[in-house]
Amino acid sequence: MLSVSEVNRRIAGLLERHFALGWVRGEISNFTRAGSGHWYFSLKDAGAQIRCVMFKGRNQYADFTPREGEAIEVRALVTLYEARGELQLSVEAIRRAGLGNLYEAFLRLKAALEAQGLFDAARKRPLPRHPHAIGVVTSLQAAALRDVLTTLHRRAPHVPVVVYPVPVQGAGAAERIAAMLDLVNARAEVDVIILCRGGGSIEDLWAFNEEPVARAVAASDIPIVAGVGHETDVTIVDFVADVRAPTPTGAAELVSPDRARMLRDVAGCWDALSATLRRQLDRRAQTVDWLARRLRSPQAQMRERRAGLAHLEGRLRFALHGRVQRAEHGQRLLAMRLDAARPDIARERTALQGIEAALARAMRATLDRAQTRLSHHQAGLELLAPQRTLERGYAVLLDAKGQAIRDPAALHARARIEARLARGAVDIEIAQVQPKLPEM
């Protein structure tokens, strides 16, 4: 009985004896450069493919590095990788055989679309800075979808995400992607579209190199960000899309506003607004102080009016006293003249009574005018009295210390104050402070 290892060794020996070193032509795919420096890739044609390895000691003499989809010729031995029982070509030499069919198709379509202006920068639209909703067109099984959703949730958890599932490789994938893009535009649910899938071979990504997808991207009314494959992968969609991202994660970062940055921007705007309001309040407070210095208080005006009234009263008393003295002096002179002339007593008494009556009338008129002026000034003082002001419907606002409140800036919501009225007082709780009253 043979072991598995023995079977594989015998098969490897048979292959090496029956397949001499020779040239094989095919199209390259799944090219990988290992950390050891070895090259691993597949060589295929329309009907089959085979794995190939070209060790570092051989590939260092190659004059080019193979690319996906490129047609090449290799000089190789048919061998068996015994550890896994896999058939492979051990490549000794490599040379170009011209561009592969896929790559030629890629170049033809690229040239045609570029000539039609589909790659022009002028037709590309800017991405919305703050999208209301983000659409993702990809396969539900794609690993890229998980990366995109994780990135969007981290950066912009407040933005809704709509996933539009569609196959991204295989037969008919291009037509279904194009139809889905048309549907997304018709539904108009999102502000920006991420068209993405993860990395893979040129065959895996080929749907994004087909004309239906390219034209659907160009016809979209909604901006599209292409995030197809890895950074080194280039597809037709990358040229037609409004923005090309190196990876699906990069596409998610491009379309999502950074929540932390937005919060910093809002904080900055709030600080600027607060500073502006503080400056305005400071200027208004300065204006109020300036007006307060110019405005005399009612108490000061009352003191001035009282002083003026006292001055008028003194002048009135002095004037009355002088008139009385002059009248008495005149009376004495008349008496002396009467004694000297010895007039008729009755006639002179009558004249004297007339003079006394005239003097009395003059004194009463003078006193009436003085009383009128005194009443006028008294009425003016009463108008300025705080009690009369309160009786006209006004109120005096006092803080907790009993001080009059002149500036609303000294108050705050829920503060308690006292309103002094003509016939009592009222306790008030502040609901809202308005720094400036509306014009009346």
Swiss-Prot record:
Top-level taxon of origin: Bacteria
Gene Ontology molecular functions: exodeoxyribonuclease VII activity; nucleic acid binding
One term under GO cellular component: cytoplasm
Top EC class for this record: hydrolase
Enzyme Commission numbers on file: 3.1.11.6
Compartments it resides in: Cytoplasm
Reaction equations catalysed: Exonucleolytic cleavage in either 5'- to 3'- or 3'- to 5'-direction to yield nucleoside 5'-phosphates
InterPro entries, per the entry: Exonuc_VII_L, Exonuc_VII_lsu_C, OB-fold_nuc-bd_dom
Protein's UniProt keywords contain Protein biosynthesis: no
UniProt keyword list: Cytoplasm, Exonuclease, Hydrolase, Nuclease
Pfam families from the UniProt entry: Exonuc_VII_L, tRNA_anti_2
PANTHER family found in the cross-reference section: EXODEOXYRIBONUCLEASE 7 LARGE SUBUNIT
Subunit structure: Heterooligomer composed of large and small subunits.
Described function: Bidirectionally degrades single-stranded DNA into large acid-insoluble oligonucleotides, which are then degraded further into small acid-soluble oligonucleotides.
Protein name: Exodeoxyribonuclease 7 large subunit
